[in-house]
Amino acid sequence: MTEKKIDRQADKAKSEQLVHQLVQRIDTHPGDADAYYELATVLVDLKSYAQAEELLMKALGLFDAQPATVEKLRYGLGNVYYAAQDYPKAIQQFDQLNDQWKGAGYLMLAQSYMANGDHKRALAFALTALGSQPKDEATLQVMAENLLALGNMAQAAQYYDQVLALDSKNGHAQFDRGLVAMVQGEPYQDYFTRAKELDPIYFDKGQKRLADIERFVQAQRSPKKPQ
């Protein structure tokens, strides 16, 4: 048996033990909304999506007179659908939330689509998230990364600048901002120097992208030979 398989089995056993404890907590304190939320989270970890959905639907009925609790439970239900990759239902839940929870929900959707290479859809969800949390660093960075992937360098630069204004020690953003500057024919070396200091792992991983962009920039600047 491999180490990874042993670790997975240990994690599963731990989660199942946690389920047992949280069920007991709910039985003892049926008015503890956090216990429902935490139990649903553990069920999602176990990929028991139908059980998590049923639990949170029940909790929404029990705590319907507590608006703040309903927000959290609805966000949890959106997470269940998100984890199960039922995005239409996740969106339906996130749409009903206040700005704080809605922004977090839509940011997750944006990150998921980005991971799958669907940058246009990711950008749409990131933009919606940004409407709820315009100064959120993670949301601004997702906006910038998708704009970069789509080749919209001018707008990507604006969003990276906002990210770096909030956190100048973000090595990931420093490196990507350098790539944008390189394509735009602007000074870029300072960004790469900072990125190497702040996030050497990301800097090393980005070397292929850097080489590709350098070749692209050189090709754009080289005079074309007459046919």
List each model region and its residues.
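Start-of-helix register in tetratricopeptide repeats
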Residues: 34, 68-72, 104-106, 138, ...
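Terminal, low-structured helical/coil segments at or just beyond the last alpha-helical repeat
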Residues: 1-7, 13-17, 189-227
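Residue-level detector of the short coil/turn that links helix A to helix B
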Residues: 13, 47, 85, 117, ...
